[in-house]
Amino acid sequence: MAFKFNAEVRTAQGKGASRRLRHNGQIPAIVYGGSEEPVSIILNHDELNNAQAHESFYSEVITLVVEGKEVAVKVQAMQRHPFKPKLVHIDFKRA
């Protein structure tokens, strides 16, 4: 199964900004690795939550569309809420 998500570049940093994103149904994430600089991004929580239920989400290359540019990534780390079925943060590594 091929996964493709639209992402926005994240400019606001910090705990308060991250909490506001999560309250609005979005999730903060970061893309790093390769020769490019790390990029903080924002993704839709519901799309990711549904996709992460599939086993292949963790092993396949995922396509992120950031500012109209496609980036091939793999999930490096994922933080979940301790008791709610919510994602808190995701780290992606460029493939």
Curated annotation (Swiss-Prot):
GO terms for biological process: translation. It comes from the Bacteria. InterPro entries: Rbsml_bL25/Gln-tRNA_synth_N, Ribosomal_bL25/Gln-tRNA_synth, Ribosomal_bL25_short, Ribosomal_L25_dom, Ribosomal_uL5_bac-type. Keywords: Ribonucleoprotein, Ribosomal protein, RNA-binding, rRNA-binding. It holds the Pfam family Ribosomal_L25p. GO terms for cellular component: cytosolic large ribosomal subunit. NCBIfam families: PRK05943.1 (NF004612). Part of the 50S ribosomal subunit; part of the 5S rRNA/L5/L18/L25 subcomplex. Contacts the 5S rRNA. Binds to the 5S rRNA independently of L5 and L18. This is Large ribosomal subunit protein bL25. It comes from Haemophilus influenzae (strain ATCC 51907 / DSM 11121 / KW20 / Rd). The gene is rplY.
